[in-house]
Amino acid sequence: MANKREFPLDKTRNIGIMAHIDAGKTTTTERILYYTGKIHKIGETHEGASQMDWMEQEQERGITITSAATTAEWKGNRVNIIDTPGHVDFTIEVERSLRVLDGAITVLDAQSGVEPQTENVWRQATTYGVPRIVFVNKMDKLGANFDYSMTTLEDRLQANAHAVQMPIGAEDEFQGVIDLIEMQADIYDEDELGAKWDTVDVPADYLEEATKRRAELVEAVADVNDDIMDKYLEGEEISKEELKAAIRQATIDLKFFPVFAGSAFKNKGVQMLMDGVVDYLPSPLDVRPYNAKNPEDDSEVELMAGDDKPFAGLAFKIATDPFVGRLTFFRVYTGTLQSGSYILNATKDKRERVGRLLQMHSNHRNEIPEVFSGDIAAAIGLKNTTTGDSLTDVDHPLILESMEFPDPVIQVSVEPESKEDRDKLDLALQKLAEEDPTFKAETNNETGETLISGMGELHLDIMVDRMRREFKVVAKIGEPQVAYRETFTKQASAQGKFVRQSGGKGQYGDVWVEFTPNEEGKGFEFEDAIVGGVVPREYIPSVEQGLKESMANGVLAGYPLIDVKAKLYDGSYHDVDSNESAFKIAASMALKNAAKQAGAEILEPIMKVEVIAPEEYLGDIMGQVTARRGAVEGMEARGNAQIVNAMVPLSEMFGYATTLRSATQGRGTFTMVFDHYSAVPKSIQEEIIKKNGGQ
């Protein structure tokens, strides 16, 4: 018998909490769980006791690495929350949680406003069309400035963000917030851990400013809502309900971003933020339809949430749990799913059996018999499913829009101590790569060396740490190296002909391929332009495969060749001696032959770097950037500090943290994000080729 759903769809919210590192995101999530009755004791991140940060490394480092999913209840609504990491190395975690969310809270530090990683996740959220509300946190902190934070939203994100609250006081005088829609003040009782507050009239000394800000808010809402605009121009009264409904609609349409204020650490403003989640962020019924494809005829399908439709969901994370093994986190878009039933992994075209279904609270779990449209849950028992796979009803296959994962930019070598460690290492690498699509492991067939690559030094540190702790691998870890790429800069055509006669059956494959540089980021594209069957149909996939395999090893120094188009336009075959492997080898020969005329170049990752330091160190920092082949893109003052924005090659950034620390007596900090690939200077290219014993 079917179970009844506990919360209707319009009372469901799937939200993420995203921010720059140290903006107080995990603390905000903790407080939400505390006030919604999920936790009985508040855990502080800086004491290493936080509920959401459940991996050992997270508690030691005080940062969030994996997106823990948890379910809370607020005023008759179910709120599924995904806590995402703020550190740039873990952008993938943010990216994949955004894919399955309907809305998000962006947390800002009231002193710093919008920071580099905030810009990153904001851009990602815009790409996925995720509506957001903003929480200006740490209003109790020295230097907290609500208006400055508001300015950075406009200047750095070009966001149409408007305050629906204003803070009462700041720094150690921060007492609560004024609700600009209700025109009431919520003032907190200092002793009650934020569980009690008084709702009173706006204090007299704030009335003028609050009235002015409310008028600005109404005007901003009128700009994005015609009905409100008409009333505004006619001078008619706009009710609170109309104002809220208009803000909700504009937020869902990504035209408006409501801003809240508070201090999660001091337990102020979190309940009003939760009201904001319910009031302004969409339920699964409010968001645009989800795009899907029918794999049988490639037709486009639009999915609207509802329990009465066939089951369709998306796996967005794989985690290994010490007690139950492999967990697949997934979002249900349509239909329902019962534990014990069979589903189709439509991406891989494989049937899977759902063992048990769990709803997660951080890393505690409740077993549930059934999940409904709009739910986020974890399944045990899915053997073939990886991140980004579509899970559907067996008779209604659909492929949901998947996720795009950036390529890793940094790598280290791993050398196991013993044969036994080699086996453990292989298992560890397989499991870790299943969990994290931006973590890659490959063994060089010629040297036998294993290289692991990821999004940054911290990312790889944590992966190595997990290999040691969870899989007990003993291994030597090399120095970090840059994940270079290779590409062609000119058009070139070449023949690849492989003929072998040595008694018995011979080998024969012959192809002509034209190579052209492709647009940056477009990857490898293959075109079959064979006319008249000079290369038989059945061998064409082998030609493409042969090109792909030899591109993986590059043509100059062994780095993958990217952004190249290959057009197979001529060739010949032998009735008896031709086979798939001969054409595969012929294709790789064509690539090698073309490389000589195609202007092959080595590309290096260029990072967008932001350095923040007191003004007196500005000269030193500019000098350091230039010495590292960097280009300064701009500078701005923030308080008494200077911010330098620059583009610097990743290879020059190793060890920069130490250099910056000693140059600024520990007062400077920096963040970096991968931006693009660019050709390395000729002299450096020659060094790299020589070092790798390349061509």
From Swiss-Prot:
Pfam families: EF-G_D2, EFG_C, EFG_III, EFG_IV, GTP_EFTU
GO molecular function annotations of the record: GTP binding; GTPase activity; translation elongation factor activity
Protein name: Elongation factor G
Cellular compartments annotated: Cytoplasm
Coiled coil: none
Gene Ontology CC terms, in alphabetical order: cytoplasm
NCBIfam families the record matches: EF-G (TIGR00484), PRK12740.1-3 (NF009379), PRK12740.1-5 (NF009381), small_GTP (TIGR00231)
Source organism of this protein record: Latilactobacillus sakei subsp. sakei (strain 23K)
Residues in tr-type G domain copies: 10-285
Binding site for GTP: 19-26, 83-87, 137-140
CDD domains in the record: EF-G, EFG_III, EFG_mtEFG1_IV, EFG_mtEFG_C, EFG_mtEFG_II
Any one GO biological process: ribosome disassembly
Organism phylogeny: Bacteria, Bacillati, Bacillota, Bacilli, Lactobacillales
Task performed by this protein: Catalyzes the GTP-dependent ribosomal translocation step during translation elongation. During this step, the ribosome changes from the pre-translocational (PRE) to the post-translocational (POST) state as the newly formed A-site-bound peptidyl-tRNA and P-site-bound deacylated tRNA move to the P and E sites, respectively. Catalyzes the coordinated movement of the two tRNA molecules, the mRNA and conformational changes in the ribosome.
PANTHER family: RIBOSOME-RELEASING FACTOR 2, MITOCHONDRIAL, TRANSLATION ELONGATION FACTOR G-RELATED
SMART domains for the chain: EFG_C (SM00838), EFG_IV (SM00889)
Similarity comment: family membership: Belongs to the TRAFAC class translation factor GTPase superfamily. Classic translation factor GTPase family. EF-G/EF-2 subfamily.
Gene3D superfamilies in the record: 3.30.230.10, 3.30.70.240, Elongation Factor G (Translational Gtpase), domain 3 (3.30.70.870), P-loop containing nucleotide triphosphate hydrolases (3.40.50.300), Translation factors (2.40.30.10)
Alphabetized UniProt keyword annotations: Cytoplasm, Elongation factor, GTP-binding, Nucleotide-binding, Protein biosynthesis
